[in-house]
Curated annotation (Swiss-Prot):
SMART domains in UniProt: Pro_CA (SM00947)
Protein name: Beta carbonic anhydrase 3
GO molecular function: carbonate dehydratase activity; zinc ion binding
Major subcellular site: cytoplasm
Localization of this protein: Cytoplasm, Cytosol
Organism: Arabidopsis thaliana (Mouse-ear cress)
Tissue and organ distribution: Strongly expressed in aerial tissues including leaves, stems, flowers and siliques, and, to a lower extent, in roots.
Catalytic activity: hydrogencarbonate + H(+) = CO2 + H2O
Residues the record lists as S-nitrosocysteine modifications: C201
Positions bearing Phosphoserine: S95
Record's signal peptide: 1-28
EC number: 4.2.1.1
Disulfide feature: none
Keywords linked to the UniProt accession: Coiled coil, Cytoplasm, Lyase, Phosphoprotein, S-nitrosylation, Signal, Zinc
Length: 258
């Protein structure tokens, strides 16, 4: 099917209106509608580009140019003390929540902040994201942060038992990593509402990820030698609280901030 050029379309419209002048008002209305749609489309693209530009200029003026010593240091190397696993959810950026500065934390974000068990044949992206900061950068702390209203956990809790993932290409397969958390919550919290079950699963899924971290030899070795600490956390952006706990698989926080 051939595509008519802009010039040909305008020419054909002109010829039609010259023959049928009574269509003038109809054509004017359609042209106005098309013009409005094109202007809106162009405006949306412009807004996105301008947001990116203005965001960088703000960063450069208020951060980069005011901290030459820091950026000269970062240009040479990085020595982060934290490796953080956090959700890709746009509401839970760990750098904002914990006020991490550039160079302070190596951050890995994915759906529902999950860490799969050690397996050389799959999830190599997570394995690489673990291996590099631990074996090369020698981070001293791993923190896995769950959060309130997590869509990944809600999706996990909603999957019917003993059924294969069918609705999505990647998501359902990924969130099954923390199926043990779902199973435990379904058993231990069966009398709670679905919403409360999800809240509990947000925390229990963190514990599953903490356990999975120990399946990586280079993680386990450093934990045993007290060279690496592993902690779980839960950020509630509805209540404005942050719970932190040690690697004892208890959801009772070591301390809570509010």
């Amino acid at each position: 099917m051939s595509t008519e050029s802009y010039e040909d379309a305008i020419k054909r419209l002109g010829e039609l209106l010259s023959k049928k002048s009574d269509l003038g008002n109809v054509a004017a209305a359609k042209i106005k509608k098309l013009t409005d749609e094109l202007e809106e489309l162009d405006s949306n693209k412009l807004d996105a580009v301008e947001r990116i530009k203005s965001g960088f200029l703000h960063f450069k003026t208020n951060n980069y140019e005011k901290n030459p010593t820091l950026y000269n240091s970062l240009a040479k190397s990085q020595t982060p003390k934290f490796l953080v696993f956090a959700c890709a959810d746009s509401r839970v950026s760990p750098s904002h929540i914990l006020n991490f500065q550039l160079g302070e934390a190596f951050i890995v974000r994915n759906i529902a902040n999950m860490v799969p068990p050690y397996d050389k044949t799959k999830h190599s992206n997570v394995g690489a994201a673990l291996e590099y900061p631990i074996t090369v950068l020698n981070v001293e702390n791993i923190l896995v942060i769950g959060h309130s209203c997590c869509g990944g956990i809600k999706g996990l809790m909603a999957i019917e038992d003993n059924t294969a993932p069918t609705k999505t290409e990647f998501i359902e397969n990924w969130i099954q990593i923390c199926a043990p958390a779902k199973n435990r919550i379904k058993q231990d919290c069966k009398d709670l509402s679905f919403e409360d079950q999800c809240t509990n699963c947000e925390k229990e899924a963190v514990n599953v990820s903490l356990g999975n971290l120990l399946s990586y030899p280079f993680v386990r070795e450093r934990v045993v030698k007290n060279k690496l600490a592993i902690r779980g956390a839960h950020y509630d952006f509805v209540k404005g609280t942050f719970d932190l706990w040690e690697l004892d698989f208890k959801t009772t926080p070591a301390f809570a901030l509010s």
